[in-house]
UniProtKB/Swiss-Prot annotation:
Triggers of expression: Induced by drougt stress, wounding and methyl jasmonate.
GO molecular function: pyridoxal phosphate binding; tyrosine decarboxylase activity
Annotated protein name in UniProt: Tyrosine decarboxylase 2
Subcellular location: Cytoplasm
Subunit: Homotetramer.
Species this protein is from: Arabidopsis thaliana
A GO biological process held by the record: amino acid metabolic process
E.C. number(s) listed in UniProt: 4.1.1.25
Keyword Oxidoreductase: no
């Protein structure tokens, strides 16, 4: 069970300005006892409302926030400390069964307020067992949901201000900081000037990469339909590869593109699963001859499956030749491109119409934060703008003002640029580069382990911090090899000590080892390899079972 020691030290202490008795203040209009009401609207230890009248609580109280905020920070800090010091208490992959929580919680919400202590006890005893610990140093399954002190503090400040910056007027700082911070990040990535706010392009923070892909598909669709007419929507064709993220297909379907008009080009090991330019041009030529209208190409830098990289230079030349919108989805690997040694992977970006990355994946900005840059902001705005009367203000009509409601699907939007600003300032770009390099080096360390063991093989060329590997086939039997790797994956993950995932490449069942959790060190990689080797021992090359 999770035991947040510092939280309880503070909660049960006295004389520290925060707690009295069992952790809640008395005499200041807050709580007393165990967190339930007495007749004056405060708490009286027996869980019942005493007196004839219950005084309403205030939803926001600065002193209660100060008191309970300290308790919550202690709780979270203890969680991170325990992830490191007591990993046996935190199975990386949750071991519960579906529906486990239903029998542990009441059927209805409480009528009377409960104490924070009771709530956090329930988190420890009931919620934590159902958590897959993405922040565990032994989490290696999917691309990271990277967190940091700076990102966490930015989320706190965002929640505290709780602004809704859908137009410039509704919070000028929210809009202007986003513009500035995304220009900063674009310069770190050495993006072309047409992606900066000083021209016709600019950046916007979407919630996720999926949202980013959706809005640019809509922008590209409307741009081409203005030229050819709306009646030709059924003729529109898009292109990706069989490694392109599944959100691309979903975005196209939402945008009214017929499923049969989504061309996912086949990849293989000869290109390390990158999109082959010759296949793309052949598909475009074939579609044009059939009367279709090619309008969108989705290239990827760092695919979800294997971190493959599509060749942007030739793809960009093809897009330019045929006047097709080229989007570059670099949700994971785009973060690494702030490092000079990885910038080469987005060479050719100058021919792209849009580019997105997820700062919450590998730039330590916490969920969610997905910067998107477009070459022509007006194509995006024309596809997404709404102008209801209740949002009409004189200042909002000025061309110098950005109204981000017209750059996204939803109206409401969080002040996400705060945490990105704080991450960039509190760490500095050089530290961020080094964080990324450390993860890549740890992945290289794991890759070396795999390469040195003749029972295993590295399946794809490693570019970043993902290693694709597997138990090698015996006597060329791929079916048996796939089954062995399935069994190995299940055995390793059932330990709760580490969590890895899998993918399929050219019919091969492949194991994925993705480094990216902020607490991961070399010892965790070594321990993970030892666990994998231990469970693989029954699958030696000489074992034909």
């Amino acid at each position: 069970m999770f035991k947040p020691q510092h939280m309880y030290d503070r909660e049960f202490g006295t004389g520290n300005g925060y707690s009295n008795g069992n952790g809640y203040t008395n005499g200041n209009g807050h709580t007393n006892g165990n967190g339930n009401y007495n007749g004056n609207g405060h708490v009286n230890g027996n869980g019942k409302a005493n007196g004839a009248k219950v005084v309403k609580m205030k939803p926001m109280d600065s002193e209660l926030l100060r008191e309970q905020g300290h308790i919550m920070v202690d709780f979270i800090a203890d969680y991170y400390k325990n992830l490191q010091d007591s990993p046996q208490d935190f199975p990386v992959l949750s071991q519960v069964q579906p529906g486990y929580l239903r029998d542990m919680l009441p059927d209805s919400a409480p009528e009377r307020p409960e104490s924070l202590k009771e709530l956090l006890d329930d988190v420890s005893k009931k919620i934590m067992p159902g958590i897959t610990h993405w922040q565990s140093p032994s989490y290696f399954a999917y691309y990271a949901s990277s967190t940091s002190v700076a990102g966490f503090l930015g989320e706190m400040l965002n929640a505290g201000l709780s602004v809704v910056g859908f137009t410039w007027l509704t919070s000028p700082a929210a809009t202007e900081l986003e513009i500035i911070v995304l220009d900063w990040l674009a310069k770190l990535l050495q993006l072309p000037d047409h992606f900066l706010s000083t021209g016709n392009g600019g950046g916007v923070i979407q919630g996720t990469g999926c949202e980013a892909v959706l809005v640019v598909v809509l922008a590209a669709r409307d741009r081409i339909l203005k030229k050819v007419g709306k009646t030709l929507l059924p003729q529109l064709v898009v292109y990706g590869s069989d490694q392109t993220h599944s959100s691309f297909r979903k975005a196209c379907l939402i945008g009214g593109i017929h499923e049969e008009n989504i061309r996912l080009l086949k990849t293989d090991s000869s290109t390390n699963y990158g999109m082959p330019p010759e296949s793309l041009e052949e598909a475009i030529s074939h579609d044009l001859a059939k009367g279709f209208i090619p309008f969108f190409i989705c290239a990827t830098v760092g695919t979800t499956s294997s971190a493959a990289v599509d060749p942007l230079v030739p793809l960009g030349n093809i897009a330019k030749k045929y006047g097709i919108w080229l989007h570059v989805d670099a949700a994971y690997a785009g973060n690494a491109c702030i490092c000079p040694e990885y910038r080469k992977f987005i060479d050719g970006i100058e021919n792209a119409d849009s580019f997105n990355m997820n700062a919450h994946k590998w730039l330590f900005a916490n969920q969610t934060c997905s910067p998107l840059w477009v070459k022509d902001r007006y194509s995006l705005i024309d596809a997404l703008k709404t102008n209801p009367e209740y949002l009409e203000f004189k200042v909002s009509k000025k061309d110098t003002v950005v109204n981000y409601k017209d750059w996204q699907i939803s109206l409401s939007r969080r002040f996400r640029s705060l945490k990105l600003w704080m991450v960039l300032r509190l760490y500095g770009s050089e530290n961020l580069r080094n964080f990324i390099r450390d993860h890549v080096n740890l992945a290289k360390h794991f890759e070396d382990y795999v390469a040195q063991d003749p029972s295993f093989e590295v399946v794809t060329t490693r570019y970043f911090s993902l290693v694709c590997f597997r138990l090698a086939p015996v006597d060329g039997d791929e079916d048996q090899c796939n089954e062995r790797n399935r069994e190995l994956l299940a055995a390793v993950n059932s330990t709760g000590k580490i969590f890895i995932s899998h993918t399929a490449l050219s019919g091969k069942f492949v194991l994925r080892f993705a480094v990216g959790a902020p607490l991961t060190e070399e010892k965790h990689v070594t321990e993970a390899w030892q666990i994998i080797q231990k469970h693989a021992s029954k699958f030696t090359r000489n074992d034909h079972y």
